[in-house]
């Protein structure tokens, strides 16, 4: 292993007789974040929310949580999965540090979300450039346009949460509106944006789709 200037170590595979690293599949995500410039873009975007004496950058905390979710986590405490693999994921904040960071960012949620969205847009361009013919924009024409799928998806909340409401399916939770770019018949949808909405939001609310 050798350190990089980004958030995550550069990991190399060898055949040395050492213990295996759990959750190593997340390296695909951390490598993508570094190669596309997402990590430095996030760092610049959220630098204003970093306290002078802070050890863990807010952007690193958020990207760690994104990796945790991808590895199957469903709460902040599940970041322990990657915290135990410091050689693979670098220093990961404690549960208390993560909680304080999220609380601080949530206090200025509108600006934070705007900054994160800008960082993601900045990283998407090099990602699609590296994808070449597999990029969703490859071969797009007026007669073969890029398709963006808007989908309202119900997410169940198993306990009382902020903005969790009864849904039209007689459940309880959230009803975000998601935008995915189509990768064609052999690919999957790539999330472009998501509008967070309470569970009682409509599936075909015109104002939400326009926004």
Annotated model-derived regions:
Residues 1-202, 207-211:
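Dynamic "connector" segments at or just before major functional cores
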């Amino acid at each position: 292993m050798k350190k990089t200037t980004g958030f995550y170590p550069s990991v190399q595979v060898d055949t040395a007789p050492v213990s295996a690293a759990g959750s190593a599949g997340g390296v695909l995500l951390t490598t993508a974040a570094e190669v596309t410039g997402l990590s430095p873009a996030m760092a610049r975007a959220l630098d204003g929310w970093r306290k002078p004496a802070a050890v863990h950058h807010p952007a690193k905390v958020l990207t760690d949580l994104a990796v945790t979710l991808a590895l199957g986590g469903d709460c902040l405490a599940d970041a322990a999965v990657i915290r135990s693999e410091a050689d693979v994921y670098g220093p990961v904040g404690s549960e208390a540090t993560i909680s304080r960071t999220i609380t601080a960012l949530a206090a200025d949620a509108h600006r934070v979300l705007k900054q994160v969205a800008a960082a993601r847009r900045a990283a998407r361009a090099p990602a699609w450039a590296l994808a070449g013919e597999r990029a969703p924009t490859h071969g797009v024409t007026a007669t073969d346009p890029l398709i963006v799928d808007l989908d309202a998806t119900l997410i169940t909340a198993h306990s009382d949460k902020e903005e969790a409401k009864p849904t039209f399916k007689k459940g309880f939770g959230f009803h975000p509106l998601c935008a995915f770019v189509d990768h064609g018949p052999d690919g999957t949808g790539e999330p472009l944006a998501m509008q967070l909405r309470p569970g009682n939001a409509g599936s075909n609310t015109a104002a939400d789709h326009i926004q």
